[in-house]
Every structure is written in C-alpha cells, then in structure tokens.
Regions:
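Partner-binding and oligomerization surfaces adjacent to conserved cores of proteins
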Residues: 1-276
Length: 276
C-alpha cells in the first residue's frame, strides 16, 4: 500500500502545471460514480488506468454544442482534442445521484477520491507526454435559451466566453452545463495534448487512459438497497442485494487491501407507516 501524500494547497498550486477554471482552489475529495464492473476492471488491472473521455462520446447535445464549432473567425483558432474526467464535489444529493447513475440491475459504486493524489498522477502524465491540464468547476449559470444564443454577439455573455479565444476559453465553454443541473456540483479535469502523437498508445475509442494510484480511493460505497417491506419478493431482493455486496466487497479488498467498503445507508432508517 502506497504512502498518503501530504501537501499543502499552496504547495500543490506551485508544483502542478495546471490551470484553474471557475474556481480559486482545489477541494479535498471528489466523488465518482461507476458500475461495479468498471471499478473492478480499474482495480484488477496490472496497471491501474483511469478513463478520460473525449466529449465526442458525450450524449447531451448541450454539453457538446461547442465541441465542433468553427472558431476560425476568432483569430483563426482551431480547437485541439480534449479528454475529460467528470466527478462531483460532494454527496449532498445522494438520492438523486444514485437514481441518475444506476442503470438496470448492475451494481453501482461511489468512489471517494483524494484529489491531491489524483492531480499529482495526472500532472506526472501531462509533463511526460506534453499535455496541458485544466481543473474546472462546471458553470451552471446559463439557462437553455442562454446557451442556445451564447454564440451570438448580442448575448450578454459573448465577450466573457469568446473574446481573446484560446485553449483556456475553449475549456470554459466545454465546462458549461444548463442551470437545471446545478444540483450535480460537478468538477471536470480536462487534458489537452500539445502533441497528440505522444498519447496514442494510451488511447482507445476516444478514451484516454492514465495511470493512477489506487491508494487515491479512500472509500467505496455500494448503491443503496431498494426500499424494503415484509413481502416475500422484497426479502428475496434484499438477500440478492446482500450477496452481491459481499461478493463485490471481497473482490475490491483482494485488489485493494484494507480498502474501506460500505453499503449506502440511504434508505436503512425509513420505517413503514402502517396506520394514521
């Protein structure tokens, strides 16, 4: 098990070659929701590789609106390829988060990631492979109609985003998300290769895989069980849930000894009202 890296925020800022966007400081912990199969794939691999996804793989048209925009009118700017890791800054909206990310029957895990360890690993990769890194807080200020019209000079936000356009401004527009999603409290870490050929061997299907220490993961939280009752079907479902949790917990600890693995207690304290 690797040693925990202890470093002050000021030392972190001075040692890292990355720019902050929409924020003035780093946060201690990031939360990442992933399916159990993907978490185990990360942990059980000989080299632990974290996925940074090209926005070309994103589904929301409002998040990709500015991905393939022609910016040549802005001093001939041509956008570079970028790769992004998305995570949340807190777990205050836990119930909504589990519902958003839980798809089908596959178990879901929330990883608590020590930000310092993650950023140091990213910084090392970036320096070795000639990449720029941006640590960005997602900007939720704009409503749907304001994002639709943002590219127009008449928009009150036009100068903020499109004057002196460069890679940093490009990352800023790629950090936009509609106001309706403000509850997500998302952060994004963007990697921008200065020499795309230097990262080719780490690319697959528009995803950039970067080596990271699994010690950066301080806690694994298993998705909550569904609200239960006294029915036989509910008891069977709870037994299946407990068996899945036990199996996945054993696999995590085998790959990451002494890992902290817990069930979410989201619904555990709810009691059924039988009579009013």
């Amino acid at each position: 098990m690797g040693k925990t890296i202890i470093i002050s925020e000021q030392q972190l800022k001075e040692s890292l070659s990355m720019q902050l966007i929409n924020c003035k400081s780093f946060i201690n912990t990031l939360y990442k929701y992933m399916t159990a199969s993907r978490v185990l794939e990360l942990l059980e691999a000989q080299e632990h590789m974290l996925a940074f996804v090209s926005p070309e793989n994103w589904y929301d048209p409002y998040e990709t609106k500015f991905l393939k925009t022609d910016y040549t009118a802005l001093n001939g700017y041509k956008q570079p390829p970028i790769y992004c890791f998305c995570a949340r800054m807190d777990n205050h909206n836990e119930e909504a988060s589990w519902k958003i990310y839980k798809k089908g029957n596959e178990p879901l895990l929330r990883m608590s990631i020590r930000t310092i360890d993650l950023l140091l690993a990213i910084d090392k990769f970036a320096k070795e492979h000639e990449c720029d890194v941006y640590f960005s807080k997602v900007d939720y200020r704009l409503k749907k109609s304001e994002i639709d019209s943002l590219h127009l000079p008449s928009s009150k936000y036009y100068d903020e985003f499109f004057s002196h356009f460069d890679d940093k401004q490009y990352v800023k527009v790629m950090s936009l998300k509609r106001w309706a999603f403000k509850y997500e409290n998302e952060y994004r870490i963007f990697i921008v290769p200065r020499k795309p050929e230097a990262i080719v061997k780490y690319l697959k299907d528009n995803i950039l895989f970067i080596p990271v220490p699994i010690e950066m993961i301080t806690r694994y939280t298993f998705n909550p069980a569904n609200k239960s009752n006294e029915s036989l079907a509910s008891q069977i479902e709870m037994a299946k849930y407990s068996a899945e949790y036990k199996l996945i917990r054993e696999k995590i600890i085998k790959a990451h000894p002494n890992a902290k693995v817990y069930k979410s207690a989201l619904y555990s304290k709810i009691t059924q009202t039988s009579k009013i």
